[in-house]
């Protein structure tokens, strides 16, 4: 094992130290959260060395040390894949987690179970690292389920609240639907290729049937909150803000996209799956952007923007650009985590007020938080030379020069424009104008944990895109020539979005709508999707179950067997008897018919 892989394993295994220490030393320790935060910072610094070595040499490594078990001809072993995707993602995830852990020291300082909270976050990080570095489906599935169960525990952290419990249950149920697809794909690979190792699967048959790939797409739909299985992500905002910043913006929700990137060698020549992926991503990115326009909860707006960006990543995979989707995963993590932390800072300072209509004028009261929020929003919209620009602008350019589904690409452009609209709406409502919160609210953002954590991500939101895109060579040949109007498309639609948002804000200030329009209702009620899916099927199920339980037993078994069947039998026999008229000619006729039929049959038989 060379130095490169040793250092990478050291940076990952150091994360398990706080878990081990908590098992050995069970009594409460007030310094434990600080200990966890420091360990993650050390892991991040250590992971930078192998990443730099990888960027310099470009040498991928597979570590396969521990053989676990053999089932007939299937060999299961612990295998780590240190390639382009895992080597770049690990430092990004560790950096973001380090900042969020420090933010949690401020945000959760009054929580009596802060030690357990940090343990949960650390366990989540370990399972995420298992998922990213896995070289076989079995190991990947362990990480996949691990992040799912940690998401459930962390969303329902404040278990005294009904909403938190409902949201946690909703998240796990929607993810279960996705997991069915994952398990189906695993079973297919086991029966047809007799292996779960990624290299062997890719080598054996690149032209698979659509079934396992559809299973993987369903798994990605569940985990990455794509249209159809998307309602759990906005509901997950019931959890604490650090959970939203870490799990539901930058790391866990991109696991579905990461899965599709991992299996891209099987998808790149499959037109059906590519088209399905593209259309699914386009519908998601537009639908969730529309839903974000009229929400009033600051965290829900950012959650819908996350879902919209995930849709954009899926679109990028759909136009056969997995490396570009991965670049967007890495750049998106910085500013989206920072946006959540800024919203958490505002919520905490305003005594847990999340409604943007009850904020306002915070630019003077919270200069650092609001500046970071504005820069994060600009990075999200793809402002030139901020982090988001380096991936988002490339995605729009590649989409414009792609010859695939034009409708899907048009929907993506509209969604990009709407990104600017809801980002500007947050800035207008929360930061500008007159203060609309209680005058006795004491606002204080002068805490080193808060300032340092946001500051690090702020630097990342400005410079990370430049560094990542400069140090990583392009893997596909870029377009050599492009008309100037196509080059400026992304910037144009963003500016259009800003203009539209300014116009809307002026209308909102000067005009009161007595009756909301149908479009407003559609957006505000999330496209009626939760109303339909969470009300009608359960109602039909419950009423059918009640009827089958209460009526089936009584009506069929008890009534039909004895009382009803006896009466039916008596009625039929009485009808039969009463129709007999007692005339001899009728009896003779019946004899004659029988005789004729028997003679005919006898003749035919001969």
UniProtKB/Swiss-Prot annotation:
Membrane topology classification: Multi-pass membrane protein
Biological process (GO), any one: mitochondrial respiratory chain complex I assembly
Localization per record: Mitochondrion inner membrane
Keywords noted in UniProt: Electron transport, Membrane, Mitochondrion, Mitochondrion inner membrane, NAD, Respiratory chain, Translocase, Transmembrane, Transmembrane helix, Transport, Ubiquinone
EC top class, as a word: translocase
EC code(s) of this entry: 7.1.1.2
Main location: mitochondrion
Parts of the chain that traverse the membrane: 4-24, 38-58, 87-107, 117-137, 140-160, 171-191, 211-233, 241-261, 273-293, 301-320, 325-347, 366-386, 413-433, 457-477, 488-508, 584-604
Molecular-function GO terms, alphabetical: NADH dehydrogenase (ubiquinone) activity
Catalysed transformations (reactions): a ubiquinone + NADH + 5 H(+)(in) = a ubiquinol + NAD(+) + 4 H(+)(out)
The organism's place on the tree of life at top rank: Eukaryota
Matches recorded under Pfam families: NADH5_C (PF06455), Proton_antipo_M (PF00361), Proton_antipo_N (PF00662)
GO terms for cellular component: mitochondrial inner membrane
GTP-binding among keywords: no
Summary of the function given for this chain in its UniProt record: Core subunit of the mitochondrial membrane respiratory chain NADH dehydrogenase (Complex I) which catalyzes electron transfer from NADH through the respiratory chain, using ubiquinone as an electron acceptor. Essential for the catalytic activity and assembly of complex I.
Quaternary structure and partners: Core subunit of respiratory chain NADH dehydrogenase (Complex I) which is composed of 45 different subunits.
NCBIfam families: NDH_I_L (TIGR01974)
Family membership: Belongs to the complex I subunit 5 family.
Protein name per Swiss-Prot or TrEMBL: NADH-ubiquinone oxidoreductase chain 5
Upper classification of the organism: Eukaryota, Metazoa, Chordata, Craniata, Vertebrata
